From Swiss-Prot:
Protein name per the record: ATP synthase subunit delta
Job description of the protein: F(1)F(0) ATP synthase produces ATP from ADP in the presence of a proton or sodium gradient. F-type ATPases consist of two structural domains, F(1) containing the extramembraneous catalytic core and F(0) containing the membrane proton channel, linked together by a central stalk and a peripheral stalk. During catalysis, ATP synthesis in the catalytic domain of F(1) is coupled via a rotary mechanism of the central stalk subunits to proton translocation.
Record keywords, A-Z: ATP synthesis, CF(1), Hydrogen ion transport, Ion transport, Membrane, Thylakoid, Transport
Protein's membrane topology: Peripheral membrane protein
Organism taxonomic ancestry: Bacteria, Bacillati, Cyanobacteriota, Cyanophyceae, Synechococcales
Gene: atpH
């Protein structure tokens, strides 16, 4: 990943500078999250965008049809530059790096929450309050994901701190305790 990071950083920094100047950093951060969701959810789209067989113009047309009206000109221009330079392979790295730089700049803490199943809005709100209390700030960006291997409960990662409130974690800890006792 260091190679992709070194490739992604200049693009992400340039996007951040442009969006700051235009006063659209927060909007673009939200758009980056949406684009990452599309990228991660659609293997066919991802494969087409990184394919060396597909011409850059065809990739740009596909991008315009998919997201052209839904993103700011700053983001769409970045996508066109990545397509022209055959750098769409680093698309997710650029988006993630932008979000990282944006959070650093805004003093926002990232909390990653994995749950065994999708959380309701009430559960998300309650969890958000707990995570904000743990972080000691209201500026927390929560990244929710579903991980059925947890069986039940959730795991919160906040910086170097990990809170494992999952059923699989409890079973693992119980197994370790039993192994020590015998």
């Amino acid at each position: 990943m260091p190679l992709l990071n070194s490739l992604a950083t200049p693009y992400a920094e340039a996007l951040l500078q442009v969006t700051e100047a235009r006063g659209e950093s927060e909007t673009v951060a939200d758009q980056c999250k949406q684009l990452l969701a599309i990228w991660n959810d659609s293997e066919d789209f991802r494969d087409a965008m990184v394919s060396p067989v597909l011409e850059p113009d065809a990739k740009k047309q596909a991008l315009k049809a998919l997201v052209g009206e839904d993103v700011t000109p700053s983001v769409f221009n970045l996508l066109k530059v990545l397509a022209d330079r055959q750098r769409l392979i680093a698309f997710d790295a650029v988006m993630l790096r932008y979000l990282e730089l944006y959070r650093e700049q805004q003093g926002i803490t990232l909390a990653q929450v994995r749950s065994a199943q999708s959380l309701t809005e009430d559960q998300q709100a309650a969890l958000s309050k707990k995570v904000q209390a743990m972080a000691g700030t209201n500026k927390v960006d929560i990244d929710l994901s579903v991980d059925p291997s947890l069986i039940g409960g959730f795991v919160v990662s906040l910086g170097s701190q990990v809170i494992d409130a999952s059923l699989s974690g409890q079973v693992r800890r119980l197994g370790l305790a039993l192994a020590k006792a015998s």
